[in-house]
C-alpha cells in the first residue's frame, strides 16, 4: 500500500511539473536573459529571437572575466525536441536546419566563442580551445533543458560539425543524437591524407586538367600578376600577412585543387587554358579558390579559426614537391603565416587520437554526412567501431552535401536512422 501511495505521489508530482512549464518569455525573465531582437518569423515557429548569454572566458575560473555569447532561439513548444546548431564560426545570419524543418521542432543556434558578437573584449588565446567551447555549449544545454526537457539533437556543418564532435566528447550526456555534416577529423596541422586524396579523387582526366591549370598559372605567373593585383585592389584585398601580393598569388594557385574538389562549383570543361585572357584566368581562379582567403582582411577576421586549426583541430597544407620548379616565393606549406611569431602555436597531437578512440569505443547515435568528392572527406570519420552510429557519403558530393540534396533512397536512410535514435 505504501508503495502504491509513493507511486501515486510521484505521478502527481510529475503532472504538476508538466503543468508548471513556463512560457519562453517567463523563462527568459526568470533567468535574466534579455532579448536582443526578434527576427522575421517563419510559419514553423512561434517566435525567433536573438539573445546574449553571459559566459566565463575561462570556465575553470567562473568568477573571472566574461563575454556575451550570441544564440538564436526558434521556439515552437517545450514538449518538442530541440535541435542545437553549433555554428563553429560567427552566426551573423540565421537559418533553419533541415533537421529542424523535418522534425518541426525547436531550434537553438549557438555562435562560437571568439567569433562575431561572441568575441571577448580581450583575446586571451589560451582560452580558445575545444574544452572551453564545449563547456560553453554544455552551459547552454544545461540552462535550456529547464525549458526544453525533451530530446536534444546537436548538428553543425564543417567546423560546426567538428564542434558537435568535441562537445559530445567532453559532455557525452548532453544530447541524444549528433549529426555532423562534412566534418573532418584531422591528425596534424598538415594532414597529409589530403595529398593522397587529391591524387585519386574524381577521374584521371579531370585531375589532369586541374593540375595542368595550376602548373600553367604558376609557370606563367608574370602574365597574370597584373590582373591579380587589379582584381585584388578592386575588392580591397591586401596581402601583407601572407608575405606580399606575389606570394599570395602562389598560395591561391596552390589552393586551387583543394577548393576545386571541396566545392565542386565548376566542371572541368570550364577550366580555361592558355588561350584565355589574363582577366579570365583570374576571374576563374577566384571563383574556385577565393582570393579573399589569403587576404589580410580575411585572416584577421578568422584568426580564431586558424588558431584552433593550428593548436587542436588540425588543418592541411600544400604538396610543394609537385610544383617546386614553378614556385618563386612560397616555401612554407602550412598556415603558420596567419599569426605573428609572438603567439605560441603548439599543436596538441593527442586530442584527435583521443577523439577517434571515443568514436570507436563509446560514441553512439551519430549520423556523419560527407560528400564523396569533398576534399575534407580525405580526413572524414570512417571508423566507429561497433557503435550504432551511421556514416553516409553522397556519391559525387561536395562540401555542400546536405541530407536534402542526397539521392531519395539515401535521404530516407538518414531520416530512418535519425528516427530510430529518437525513439
Predicted regions and their residues:
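Bacterial Sec-dependent N-terminal signal peptides
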Residues: 1-23, 198-206
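Catalytic-loop region of hydrolases
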Residues: 19-106, 407-409, 416, 420-423
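Conserved alpha/beta-hydrolase
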Residues: 100-119
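Alpha/beta-hydrolase active-site loop
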Residues: 127-146
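Alpha/beta-hydrolase fold nucleophile elbow
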Residues: 148-158
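Glycine-rich nucleophile elbow surrounding the catalytic serine of serine-hydrolase chemistry
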Residues: 156-166
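Alpha/beta-hydrolase
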Residues: 166-305
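C-terminal subdomain of alpha/beta-hydrolase-fold enzymes, centered on the catalytic histidine
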Residues: 260-423
Amino acid at each position: 500500500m505504501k508503495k502504491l501511495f509513493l507511486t501515486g505521489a510521484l505521478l502527481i508530482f510529475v503532472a504538476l511539473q508538466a503543468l508548471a512549464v513556463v512560457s519562453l518569455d517567463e523563462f527568459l525573465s526568470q533567468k535574466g536573459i534579455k532579448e536582443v531582437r526578434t527576427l522575421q518569423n517563419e510559419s514553423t515557429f512561434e517566435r525567433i529571437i536573438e539573445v546574449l548569454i553571459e559566459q566565463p572566458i575561462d570556465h575553470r575560473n567562473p568568477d573571472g572575466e566574461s563575454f556575451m555569447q550570441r544564440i538564436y532561439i526558434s521556439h515552437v513548444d517545450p514538449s518538442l525536441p530541440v535541435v542545437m546548431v553549433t555554428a563553429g564560426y560567427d552566426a551573423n545570419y540565421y537559418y533553419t536546419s533541415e533537421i529542424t524543418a523535418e522534425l518541426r521542432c525547436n531550434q537553438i543556434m549557438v555562435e562560437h566563442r571568439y567569433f562575431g558578437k561572441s568575441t571577448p573584449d580581450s583575446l586571451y588565446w589560451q582560452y580558445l580551445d575545444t574544452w572551453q567551447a564545449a563547456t560553453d555549449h554544455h552551459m547552454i544545454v544545461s540552462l535550456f533543458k529547464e525549458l526544453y526537457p525533451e530530446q536534444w539533437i546537436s548538428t553543425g556543418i564543417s567546423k560546426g560539425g567538428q564542434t558537435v564532435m568535441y562537445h559530445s566528447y567532453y559532455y557525452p550526456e548532453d544530447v541524444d543524437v549528433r549529426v555532423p555534416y562534412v566534418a573532418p577529423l584531422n591528425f596534424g596541422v598538415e594532414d597529409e591524407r589530403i595529398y593522397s586524396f587529391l591524387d585519386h579523387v574524381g577521374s584521371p582526366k579531370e585531375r589532369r586538367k586541374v593540375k595542368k591549370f595550376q602548373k600553367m598559372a604558376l609557370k606563367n605567373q608574370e602574365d597574370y600578376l597584373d590582373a591579380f593585383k587589379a582584381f585584388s585592389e578592386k575588392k580591397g584585398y591586401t596581402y601583407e600577412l601572407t608575405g606580399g601580393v606575389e606570394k599570395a598569388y602562389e598560395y591561391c594557385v596552390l589552393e586551387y585543387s583543394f577548393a576545386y574538389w571541396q566545392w565542386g562549383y565548376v566542371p572541368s570543361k570550364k577550366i580555361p587554358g592558355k588561350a584565355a585572357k589574363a582577366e579570365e584566368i583570374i576571374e576563374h581562379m577566384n571563383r574556385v579558390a577565393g582570393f579573399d582567403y589569403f587576404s589580410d582582411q580575411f585572416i584577421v577576421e578568422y584568426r580564431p579559426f586558424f588558431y584552433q586549426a593550428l593548436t587542436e583541430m588540425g588543418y592541411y597544407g600544400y604538396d610543394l614537391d609537385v610544383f617546386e620548379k614553378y614556385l618563386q616565393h612560397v616555401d612554407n606549406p602550412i598556415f603558420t603565416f596567419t599569426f605573428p611569431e609572438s603567439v605560441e602555436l603548439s599543436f596538441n597531437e593527442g586530442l584527435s587520437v583521443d577523439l577517434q578512440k571515443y568514436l570507436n569505443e563509446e560514441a553512439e547515435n551519430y549520423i556523419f554526412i560527407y560528400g564523396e568528392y569533398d576534399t575534407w572527406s580525405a580526413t572524414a570519420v570512417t571508423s566507429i567501431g561497433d557503435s550504432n552510429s551511421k556514416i553516409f557519403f553522397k556519391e559525387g558530393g561536395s562540401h555542400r552535401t546536405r541530407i536534402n540534396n542526397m539521392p531519395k533512397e539515401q535521404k530516407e536512410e538518414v531520416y530512418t536512422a535519425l528516427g530510430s535514435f529518437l525513439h
